Amino acid sequence: MNILAVDTAGKTAGVALLQDDRLLYEVYLDAGMTHSETLMPMIDTCLKMCGMTCADIDLYGVNAGPGSFTGLRIGLAAVKGLAFPRETLCAPVSTLEALAAAHTGEGTVLCALDARRAQVYSAAFDLATHSRLLEDDARAVADLADFVENCKKPLFFVGDGASLCYNKYSNVPGVL
């Protein structure tokens, strides 16, 4: 199965092509919020480098948020435009779930994206089982206190809002 994945939730745009469980190609471009100009050329390059066309794609994965509203719309519109003519399947991917999937080990990972004004888009996952412990939501950093203080496993903060959380909760036992 050939999967083309697109991430436009933040300042960095990303495109990856997987064949079954093997990564064939990935590219990230940190050119600010220029996704409307850079995403389609990134996808085109990805497909050409792998000797494929859109007809070879079995599934599109697209970041569905949280993230930049305009960035998400650009990614969703691009994938819809590529998938619709061939009725190719599309799968939404949570930004926070994707961030958690990049981490393994023992403990809990709390993914946090800076939502400004002392808020974060956040979710938490058990690293060993990848089970969700907190649903995706926008929360005040202070509103995470109950979860952080009652977490029974080592707790790691990841994402561009991690420092906000760590600064608030670094004195809580188990926070690493």
Enumerate the predicted regions with their spans.
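Buried hydrophobic packing segments
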Residues: 43, 78-82, 99-100
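Surface "functional belts" at beta-alpha junctions
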Residues: 22, 89-176
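Glycine/Thr-rich phosphate-binding loops of Rossmann-like dinucleotide-binding domains
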Residues: 14, 70, 165-167
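Residues at secondary-structure transition points
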Residues: 30-38, 69-73, 77, 94
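N-terminal beta-alpha supersecondary unit
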Residues: 1-64
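Phosphate-handling active-site elements
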Residues: 48-55, 84-93
